[in-house]
Amino acid sequence: TSLPLPRPQRLRFSIGPEIGPEVERAKRHLDSLAADVDVHCFSHEGFGPGAGPRPEALVQVALQVAFYRAHGSLCATCEPTSLRGVLPGCTDLLRPPGPPCLALAQALDDPHAQPELQMALLREAVEAQNSRTQEVLAGQGPERHLQGLRQAAIAAGEPLPEIFLDPTYAQATHFRLCILQVRSREGCWLLRGPLVPDGYGVGVGHVCPPDPQDPPGHSGGLRVAVTAFTCCHDTEAAHLGAAIRGVFDSLGGLLRCHGPP
């Protein structure tokens, strides 16, 4: 239950001539940034009880498959995750498991692949995602440790370890897909911008109706918001959004026939 809050008071700022031009310049810059963001939103019925107790893992896997359909390959992906259970106030980045997601994406696009094989690959990918999630929530994710190593070197005035100068590391941290997921009873639209010029931001709101007869993990639907930069010709929010919707439909059909992953 939410506590009643007092009515907010309007704050009035006195802007002098010394900072007035800077404020106007910042407003124009912000408007130009907002004008460069392409947004595509849609609602989906979700996966129902077939999603299991952790639908977030299923959605993460589905988004990997959708990116593969849209661009023909997987990409570096991150989902900011709270570490409040072990490090209050801290976050880490959750990455999806690449190999099982790639195998699933290829099987779903193979007209000769049997549904039983597709379902087995889906289970493998979701289990791998759940395993990574538990690892990160326990404070054992690699991203925070690597960041700690970088900051320790900077604080000590030492050269950065070679791993941070390797082109592979730069590619692995070029997050073309940044994901945000939140559960709520009323349903909400989550918009976040891309992290890189040729990337996407994807927010997924899990609508969880407060019905005591619903099984654990039952989802009342999904609200998906996809963002991209209009200045990039390699990305289009509606294009990825259509791929996401198609993958949700494909996985929903598998789950209705074969049960939760």
Tell where the protein language model's regions lie, with residue ranges.
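Acyl-CoA-dependent O-acyltransferases
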Residues: 1-261
